[in-house]
């Protein structure tokens, strides 16, 4: 059986056990929809992110709640990009990078940088809501 590394990452904080937790599977190749849903249900966090290679962007990311897949999520995007930067999968040697992530709603930009103190900073922009 294939093994997958699952991280629990706290977004919006610089301290452990604070912020908003999210599951992140940084290399999800080979997982089926049913397996991703089972992992999200088992973790029982508000969202779990699964990262895949993409032909249209730097990464393809899918988000699952314990009950279903969702098209876009804020704090999981931040947790995912932080994780990919920490794993060295986002090159921050120039200090900052605009990363393109493919989601079911399209390709969206995320800005990732390494601050002078060494911490990773992630900024995402979303379209204005329509009511």
Give each language-model segment a name.
Residues 58, 64-131:
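Acidic, low-complexity central loop/insert segments
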Residues 24-27, 51-52:
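Short beta-strand-to-turn element immediately C-terminal to the catalytic PLP-Schiff-base lysine
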Residues 1-18:
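N-terminal, positively charged, Ser/Thr/Ala/Gly-biased leader segments
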Residues 17-25:
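Generic N-terminal amphipathic, Lys/Arg-enriched alpha-helix
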Residues 12, 40-42, 101:
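Short Gly/Pro-enriched turn/cap motifs at secondary-structure boundaries
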